[in-house]
Amino acid sequence: MPNGVFSNLNSKGIEVGIKLVNSHHVKAVGFTGSLKGGRAIYDLASKRIHPIPVFAEMGSVNPVLIFPKKLKKEYAELAKQYAKSITVGSGQFCTNPGIIISFESDDFDLFIKRLVEEIEQISPSCMLHPNIYNAYNLGLEKIKQNSNVSELTREINITDKNYPKHVISHVSAEKF
């Protein structure tokens, strides 16, 4: 890449992002992440003396449909692939799957059991920002308060800041 071009900046706060968006050298911003973060970037960019465009994908949840024939043949491999896919980048990629939709069956039960086993073997990785980590944990707490949702992964204690616990939860289509 040419000098001065980058695709990602990590920091412990929002100061780097604010400086970047406000820099007169920056002519546009691309962002993938939360609605709150994207909106903050948009607001900064629009308040500049010479406003700049913001290209943002914010707050997506990507569904995955798993059909019975595929599940019957490849439940173990699908579970392994899905576990890797949802944990890559600490789950922060815009293309990460977010929800599985399938029919209830013995094969689906085998898939879920294997998924939990696979995900519990993957070490947590650092999230991009403390606010993302905090929002993730607040979301988990909110989900735990819903009696229709059951958490399938075991409780673990992670002491590293910004390293989230991997969680698989279940809710029926009727209750969703």
Kindly label every feature range from the protein language model.
Residues 3-8, 31, 53-56, 90, ...:
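Acidic/polar loop patches that form or flank catalytic/metal-binding clefts of enzymes
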Residues 16-18, 53, 87-89, 139-140, ...:
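Generic recognition of flexible, low-complexity loop/linker segments
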Residues 105-176:
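NAD(P)-dependent aldehyde/semialdehyde dehydrogenase
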